[in-house]
Each structure stands twice: as C-alpha cells, then as structure tokens.
C-alpha cells in the first residue's frame, strides 16, 4: 500500500533512481495506491547524465509493492521492494528498459508496453 510521502525505487533506465509520491491518481481508494495505479512523483535521486533531474515532477505507475496483491485464484504476490516506472502522458514508459519482475495485473490495466519491456512477468 503506497501513500503520499512514500519513497519508491525506479525500475527503469529513465535516469531517476528514487522518487517520492506527492499525489495518487485514480487509485483503488483515495489514500492508498496498489499495483497498476498511477501516481504523481517528484524525483529525489537521479543519475547526473540522465534526462530526468532531481526535483522534476512526473507521472509513474506502480509495478511492485511489498504489501502484495491478492489474485482471483486466492494466491498472493509480494515483492521485496516498492517500485515504479516513469511514464509519459500517453501511458508509455519514458525509459527503454525495465529492471526486475513485474506483476501481470498491469496487462489488465492496459500497460502493454511496460509488459513487453519487462524482464520477467509474474
């Protein structure tokens, strides 16, 4: 469960390394966001040679959470970290690679480009 002021790891090669959530858009509830929800973030740590700089305000989609997600078959999926992928306004990723595994629930939420770039889909 991600809320405002949560710090998240960035799972792509856009140049940002760590972000802070400042708002939740279209979340399942008003206060918490889960896998597949879009959040507004500000960049806290970035690499110096990247296109994204510290302080930039961007949109991102949550791809991994420690809290986990209950699937329709009754199983749960949990990850070791909370992670996001930086996206553009047309919901395509800004980076060209996505690191780590992501949940297949993103396919149901129409993030097919992120699914195709991911190393592993669980």
UniProtKB/Swiss-Prot annotation:
- Transmembrane region positions? none
Mind telling me which GO cellular component terms the entry cites?
A: cytosolic large ribosomal subunit
Q: Which PANTHER family match?
A: 50S/60S RIBOSOMAL PROTEIN L14/L23, LARGE RIBOSOMAL SUBUNIT PROTEIN UL14M
Q: Which UniProt keywords apply?
A: Ribonucleoprotein, Ribosomal protein, RNA-binding, rRNA-binding
Protein name per its UniProtKB record: Large ribosomal subunit protein uL14
What functional role does this protein have? Binds to 23S rRNA. Forms part of two intersubunit bridges in the 70S ribosome.
What organism is recorded for this protein?
Phytoplasma mali (strain AT)
Q: Which PROSITE patterns does this one have? A: RIBOSOMAL_L14
Gene responsible for this protein: rplN
Query: Superkingdom of this entry's organism?
Result: Bacteria
Q: GO biological process annotations for this chain's record?
A: translation
Which protein family is named in the record? Belongs to the universal ribosomal protein uL14 family.
Cite the GO molecular-function annotations of the record. large ribosomal subunit rRNA binding; structural constituent of ribosome
* Subunit description: Part of the 50S ribosomal subunit. Forms a cluster with proteins L3 and L19. In the 70S ribosome, L14 and L19 interact and together make contacts with the 16S rRNA in bridges B5 and B8.
